[in-house]
């Protein structure tokens, strides 16, 4: 463990200007990023008596081996640079906002030609608008059921859309007028996008305009004695009003604001945000925050600053639109307290919005009452998280301890990797590698392997495939470990930078012995290897004649099963994808100069390969990007008999 005194810079060498600093570990990875009004004052505080530091700060400075800094002109520049570096390096000791993905949102895929309305859980993506979150998925479906009467936008998946386009017949929603059926050309892409834009405007708070328009249309239809249409418009108006009733008015002055509140303990904090648009709560989001390692960053003022910087910085990147309805930064941000650099933060937020933003603490009235409601939600979220964390942590700790005791390991296997092989009768043979850290899946470290040497031409050898994946995984680890140039200059981890404590293979004695032989061949002796056989859930250890039998109800066996099943799922998914690509390979793939984009354009234009085969050169050249030479080559590929018969 590095001693902070070994890399402490001389106090006189640290500038007193504002700037941003970063700590690196012995491998060069960035582990913490911070900013300061005075670099000298802030950095000196890290090298005080280690015993007096906050436990997380103490762990950070004893993990680090180097500190470096960049001087900037203003605190606003420091704020922006700190945000950029945290986003780029993802330092392990910085505050991390884990978005509560358990709540569903209503997503609108504006980045598609025909945008889709759908229930969504997961990280935010660029080009997609989100409304919510909602307490339950059924609440979103109920809202969609009401609003698609008035805004008949597409809600189907890409597969369903493609299928109905091919058969030239809409789905049930198209027949009952809850979808405008863009799949069969009932509306154009521009008309469908206008429907979606109106839907987004309604959910953004511009509700009165649509209600007035429907009421006018209803009265006009009644005046023309078109009572059937008037009745339908009356029902549509009722659906709109019921949807509006679901969003309570909390601020009567048409306020556009985000209301932020925190609840914290010594290690973590809960953040809750209510998004108020047009005086109505349009959504609620929550995060759980691991507190920073910075000795001055544990107070509420610092939590406010860090949250605003990370949240609105990411929202601006995902949104980036200047229109008021989709601007990621509201006119007003209400917080429990103002940070010391409130003026700089306000200036930065105003720059993101493109107009003035007010950052203030609500003192009285409805805004104060709403802030107290958000605060109660934050306290409840932190309490629920602590209860859940205690249960999860105890179960995972027990599982890791069970595995350690059953296998006689020197320490608990904090990083477990598992490999599995998937194929059908020797075709499309693939391997998967999944990673669990501290008993939880680390999906960013998952890897696929296309088996090269141990399979091919309809043959497959599972044992040899296990050996191949093991060799490729650990050979890469050794090359990164021994070659300093393989380390990312930005301090990011390479794919196989960390070896596992426990390496699990799906199978029995032959598979585990093959993996063990590869590790022995590579000179790796500090990685335990086991095999988990499916039928009896036996745990096989290299060179042992009998398996280890773990209790059927033990947490350790349950964790190993989860790891093995996840590896199997990941391998099956990749195998199916690879097989599907092979089975759907088109004769167009062989046309020289015809790339994937233009192949899709041809099939989309004609609807099928059969129709394309019947087309003429002139009809094919009507597709954007297709010239005469390419059209001729396409027809030669589709009509090989005719091209051979031609003189």
UniProtKB/Swiss-Prot annotation:
Signal peptide: none
Keyword field contains DNA repair: yes
Superkingdom classification of source: Bacteria
Keyword Lipid biosynthesis: no
Matching Pfam families: GIY-YIG, HHH_5, UVR, UvrC_RNaseH, UvrC_RNaseH_dom
Residue ranges occupied by any GIY-YIG domain in the UniProt entry: 16-95
GO biological process, one term: nucleotide-excision repair
UniProt-annotated location(s): Cytoplasm
Gene Ontology CC entries for this record: cytoplasm; excinuclease repair complex
Principal location class: cytoplasm
Domain UVR span(s) in chain numbering: 208-243
Keyword tags: Cytoplasm, DNA damage, DNA excision, DNA repair, Excision nuclease, SOS response
Assembly mode: Interacts with UvrB in an incision complex.
Family: Belongs to the UvrC family.
Function: The UvrABC repair system catalyzes the recognition and processing of DNA lesions. UvrC both incises the 5' and 3' sides of the lesion. The N-terminal half is responsible for the 3' incision and the C-terminal half is responsible for the 5' incision.
Designated name of the protein: UvrABC system protein C
Protein source organism: Mycolicibacterium paratuberculosis (strain ATCC BAA-968 / K-10) (Mycobacterium paratuberculosis)
Gene: uvrC
């Amino acid at each position: 463990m590095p001693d902070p005194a070994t890399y402490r810079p001389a106090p006189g060498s640290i500038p007193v200007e504002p700037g941003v600093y970063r700590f690196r570990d012995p491998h060069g990875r960035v582990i913490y990023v911070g900013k300061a009004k005075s670099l000298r004052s802030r950095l000196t505080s890290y090298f005080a008596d280690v015993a007096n530091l906050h436990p997380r700060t103490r762990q950070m400075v004893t993990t680090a081996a180097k500190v470096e800094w960049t001087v900037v002109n203003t605190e606003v520049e420091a704020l922006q640079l700190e945000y950029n570096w945290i986003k780029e390096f993802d330092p392990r000791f910085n505050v991390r906002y884990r978005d509560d993905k358990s709540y569903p949102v209503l997503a609108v895929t504006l980045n598609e030609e025909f945008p889709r309305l759908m229930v969504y859980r997961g990280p935010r993506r660029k080009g997609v608008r989100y409304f919510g979150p909602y307490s339950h998925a059924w609440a979103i479906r109920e809202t969609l059921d009401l609003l698609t009467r008035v805004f008949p936008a597409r809600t189907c998946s890409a597969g369903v859309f493609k299928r109905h386009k091919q058969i030239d017949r809409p789905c049930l929603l198209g027949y009952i007028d809850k979808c405008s059926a863009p799949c069969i050309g009932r509306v154009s892409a521009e008309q469908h996008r206008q429907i979606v834009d109106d839907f987004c405007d309604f959910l953004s708070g511009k509700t009165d305009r649509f209600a007035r328009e429907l009421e006018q249309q209803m009265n006009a239809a009644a005046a023309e004695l078109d009572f059937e249409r008037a009745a339908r418009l009356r029902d549509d108006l009722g659906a709109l009003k019921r949807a509006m009733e679901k969003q309570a008015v909390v601020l009567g002055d048409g306020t556009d604001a985000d209301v932020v509140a925190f609840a914290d303990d010594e290690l973590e904090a809960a953040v809750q945000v209510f998004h108020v648009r047009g005086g109505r709560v349009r959504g609620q989001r929550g995060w759980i925050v691991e507190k920073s390692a910075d000795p001055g960053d544990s107070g509420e003022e610092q939590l406010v600053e860090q949250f605003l910087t990370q949240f609105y910085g990411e929202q601006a990147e995902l949104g980036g639109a200047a229109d008021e309805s989709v601007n990621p930064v509201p006119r007003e941000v209400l917080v429990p307290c103002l940070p010391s650099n409130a003026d700089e933060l306000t200036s930065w937020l105003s720059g993101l919005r493109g107009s003035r933003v007010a950052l203030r603490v609500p003192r009285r009235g409805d805004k104060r009452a709403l802030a107290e409601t958000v605060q109660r939600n934050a306290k409840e979220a932190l309490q629920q998280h602590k209860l859940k964390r205690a249960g999860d942590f105890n179960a995972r700790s027990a599982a890791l301890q069970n595995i350690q005791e059953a296998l006689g390991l020197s320490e608990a296997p904090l990083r477990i990797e598992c490999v599995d092989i998937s194929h059908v009768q020797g075709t499309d043979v693939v391997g998967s590698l999944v990673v669990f850290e501290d008993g939880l899946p680390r999906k960013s470290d998952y890897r696929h392997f296309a088996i090269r040497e141990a399979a091919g031409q309809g043959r497959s050898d599972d044992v040899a495939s296990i050996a191949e994946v093991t060799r490729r995984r650990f050979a890469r680890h050794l090359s990164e470990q021994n070659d300093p140039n393989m380390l990312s200059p930005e301090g990011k981890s390479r794919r196989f930078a960390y070896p596992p404590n426990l390496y699990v293979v799906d199978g029995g004695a032959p598979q585990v012995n093959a993996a063990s032989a590869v590790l022995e061949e590579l000179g790796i002796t500090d990685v335990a290897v086991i095999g988990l056989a499916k039928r009896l859930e036996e745990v096989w250890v290299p060179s042992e004649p009998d398996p280890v039998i773990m209790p059927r109800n033990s947490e350790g066996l349950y964790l190993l099963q989860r790891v093995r099943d996840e590896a199997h799922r990941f391998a099956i998914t990749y195998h199916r994808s690879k097989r599907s690509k092979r089975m759907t390979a088109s004769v167009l793939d062989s046309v020289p100069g015809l790339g994937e984009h233009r192949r899709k354009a041809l099939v989309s234009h004609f609807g099928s390969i059969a129709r394309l085969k019947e087309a003429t050169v002139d009809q094919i050249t009507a597709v954007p990007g297709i010239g005469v030479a390419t059209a001729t080559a396409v027809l030669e590929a589709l009509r090989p008999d005719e091209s051979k018969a031609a003189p």
